[in-house]
């Protein structure tokens, strides 16, 4: 801003006026008279002769440029052969800007010149939000973790928690650097403040700030715990993998011959182990996935959740009732329900390829982030299996950690039965789902879309499990078991003595009588649900109830905890 003064104003007075106005207005000020400028503030006032760059500063800047270029040429050729992006280009894909780094000169000596010791740590912004990061540089010793890299990781994670910001880990490492020159005699990476401390920090920081991992290469042995300790893990197709031992070690120890893709590739962890939350085709998609996940999460557990502008669902909510068949055993896709409840293009599914009989994911309702847990009737009728119980339990626990409200869409015949699921731990793992639902203190809403049989309604946050509302649609049925199972349980011995025709007639009569007891209108009259509502009103009801419970109080707990471990 230019301010004009009288010619008689001396330079000292003009400078005082300029300084006072600049401090008051918060912008540079230039004082002028008829002869020209008399005083100015801001960068324009700097003495250009004072901007001298010394030789020692030039040397540092030259070293910085060398460090920024990463490892030797053969390292860059290697990532090109593997189809990978250079780590600094990877950061540029994800971040609006990287504001600073720590430890860029780690292990950068006359003898070593290991740029940043192969691990870049720092701070930046993603969609305007502060995020701390670690990123392996595969061009430096294949991204392996050396002594200084471990130190950098430990400092980064502790500072992120102190600052109250998410941690993003871009993992592209072959694990601990084991060559002899890396350590003194007796050093095994297991010391009190060494490699193990990284995993310790990930554990004790869990639920304090979001931890997101993206896996860009094979991660083997102990370091493979880094990605699975993250709240969310994205794996890049064709180039990523993780396993507790390499294929070579596996063959040496067990005789099994297998490649990395079959041992611990993305599809293994997306469809069988459940360790991976999303598989993406390339690094650009990985960057998009990171931004998507962050858009639902707070900066820290006690910070407000990010809100977005409200947009209508992709499909008309008034058509919801027509989606749900009358017959309790007829299949439909629960995504058709979700599409009529959540804001358009806000659905982000978690573990979509794993335990597909139960759907978990984030969405927005009226711009507010929510976690959705939904039975999937078009896959094994939505029965809950050991894998899906554990999948749901983990998701519920994460939502509770970051105070994200939960919406359960219940349509399940209950927990699966049979010798196979018993051997797979249906009771042991099923209890985790019920435990997580019971202990979650965020706003919880149970929507009974159709079947709510047996212990399935317990896990899906039924009336006894602390739901802030149990809402029933006209198609809802709540029962200890389905009509078929109930009739056989009650009258099995009696029916065994009947001939075929008599038995069929008896079954139909008994089922009809049983149906009267589970009629949702009768149950609503007994207040077994909070509200029976037209399906087309569900979205509006959830909007209102989410708003009402937006400031729900959590019960303060001491450090004593339950015994059910996830």
Predicted regions and their residues:
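A short amphipathic beta-strand at an alpha->beta junction
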Residues: 23-36
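Ligand-binding clefts of soluble mixed alpha/beta catalytic domains
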Residues: 36-566
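Short, non-transmembrane amphipathic alpha-helical segments
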Residues: 11-25
């Amino acid at each position: 801003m230019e301010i004009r003064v009288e010619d008689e104003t001396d330079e000292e007075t003009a400078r005082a006026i300029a300084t006072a106005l600049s401090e008051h207005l918060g912008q540079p000020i230039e004082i002028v008279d008829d002869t020209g400028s008399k005083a100015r503030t801001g960068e324009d006032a700097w003495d250009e002769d004072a901007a001298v760059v010394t030789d020692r500063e030039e040397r540092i800047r030259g070293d910085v440029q060398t460090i920024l270029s990463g490892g030797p040429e053969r390292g860059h050729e290697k990532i090109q052969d593997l189809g990978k992006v250079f780590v600094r280009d990877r950061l540029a894909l994800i971040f609006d800007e990287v504001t600073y780094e720590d430890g860029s000169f780690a292990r950068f000596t006359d003898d070593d010149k290991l740029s940043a010791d192969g691990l870049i740590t720092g701070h930046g912004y993603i969609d305007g939000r502060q995020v701390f990061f670690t990123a392996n540089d595969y061009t430096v010793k294949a991204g392996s973790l050396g002594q200084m890299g471990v130190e950098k990781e430990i400092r980064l994670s502790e500072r992120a928690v102190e600052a109250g910001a998410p941690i993003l880990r871009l993992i592209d490492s072959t694990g601990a650097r084991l060559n002899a020159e890396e350590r003194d005699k007796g050093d095994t990476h297991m010391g009190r403040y060494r490699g193990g401390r990284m995993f310790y920090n990930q554990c004790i920081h869990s639920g304090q700030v979001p931890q997101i991992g993206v896996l860009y290469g094979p991660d083997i042995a102990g370091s493979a715990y880094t990605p699975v300790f993250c709240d969310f893990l994205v794996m890049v197709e064709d180039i990523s993998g993780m396993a507790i031992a390499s294929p070579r070690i596996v063959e040496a120890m067990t005789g099994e011959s297998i490649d990395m893709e079959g041992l611990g590739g993305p599809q293994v962890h997306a469809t069988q182990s459940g360790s991976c939350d999303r598989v993406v085709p390339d690094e650009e998609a990985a960057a998009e996935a990171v931004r998507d996940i962050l858009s639902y999460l707070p900066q820290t557990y006690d910070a407000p959740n990010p809100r977005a502008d409200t947009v209508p669902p992709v499909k008309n909510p008034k058509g919801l009732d027509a989606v749900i068949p009358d017959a309790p055993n007829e299949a439909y896709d629960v995504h058709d329900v979700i599409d009529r409840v959540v804001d358009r293009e806000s659905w982000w599914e978690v573990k979509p390829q794993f335990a597909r009989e139960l759907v978990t994911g984030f969405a927005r309702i009226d711009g507010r982030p929510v976690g959705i847990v939904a039975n999937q009737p078009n896959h094994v009728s939505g029965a809950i299996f050991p894998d899906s119980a554990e999948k749901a339990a983990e998701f519920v626990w994460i939502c509770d950690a970051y105070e994200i409200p939960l919406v359960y869409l219940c349509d399940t015949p209950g927990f699966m039965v049979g010798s196979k699921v018993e051997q797979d731990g249906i009771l042991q793992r099923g209890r985790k789902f019920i435990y997580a639902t019971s202990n979650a203190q965020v706003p919880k809403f149970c929507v009974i879309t159709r079947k709510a049989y047996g212990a399935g309604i317990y896990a899906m946050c039924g009336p006894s499990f602390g739901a802030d509302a149990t809402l029933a649609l006209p198609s809802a049925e709540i029962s200890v078991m389905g009509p078929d199972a109930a009739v056989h349980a009650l009258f099995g011995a009696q029916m065994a003595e009947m001939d075929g025709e008599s038995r069929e007639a008896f079954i139909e009569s008994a089922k009809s009588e049983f149906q009267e007891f589970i009629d949702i209108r009768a149950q609503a009259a007994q207040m077994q649900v909070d509200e029976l509502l037209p399906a087309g009103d569900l979205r509006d009801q959830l909007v209102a109830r989410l708003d009402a419970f937006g400031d729900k109080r959590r019960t303060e707990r001491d450090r004593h905890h339950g015994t059910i471990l996830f």
